[in-house]
């Protein structure tokens, strides 16, 4: 959807965005089955046929949502003279280098800054990622975001915006703990629904035995 926000007109020929191409390429690279649930329409779950069928509609829904937001008085934040779309942020938080890309940063009609992350999954993630983006945005660009939300592509809208209230110290401890585990070569499996499409399933101790 990035090229949509930078002024390219949506056409059937352009309905394949780079993001969905990456999803399809990733499916081919995975050593295991596609994720999601099997259905009458898509018996092979979320395989290439699923993404080919769903991506154009999701993109059209996104354009409608974005235009409705603009009509309601929302706007893109300006970062270094450009619309805040796919904003790269890299900073060191308590000796841990953290890199990311903030999908969208918007300004509400009353002037509050909101970070928005685009998700193609069906479940709303926890808010930790949005809080990390808040602190990275403040450190790198000296901009304070008060709220965050996820744009859920399957629903064509965002989750309810939430105040970003997790402290930098809490986030720093999270990354410091992860760094310590990596340096000690301690990798604890986090078994769950995402295991079916995990890119490191084969070497994982849960599935390799």
Please provide the spans of the model-predicted regions.
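A non-catalytic, helix-rich entry segment at domain boundaries
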Residues: 1-85
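Active-site catalytic microenvironments for nucleophilic, acid-base chemistry
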Residues: 2-6, 135-140
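Residue-level detector of short, conserved catalytic/binding motifs and their immediate flanks
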Residues: 46, 102, 196
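A residue-level signal for conserved active-site and pocket-lining positions in enzyme catalytic cores
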Residues: 1, 104, 133, 148, ...
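Alpha-helical scaffold elements adjacent to nucleotide-binding pockets in ATP/GTP-utilizing enzyme cores
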Residues: 58, 129-133, 174-177
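Non-catalytic protein-protein interaction segments used by genome-maintenance enzymes to assemble
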Residues: 79, 84-135
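Short amphipathic alpha-helical segments and their helix-coil junctions
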Residues: 38-39, 111-115, 175-182
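Metal-dependent nuclease catalytic regions and adjoining charged, substrate-binding loops involved
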Residues: 94, 122-125, 137-209
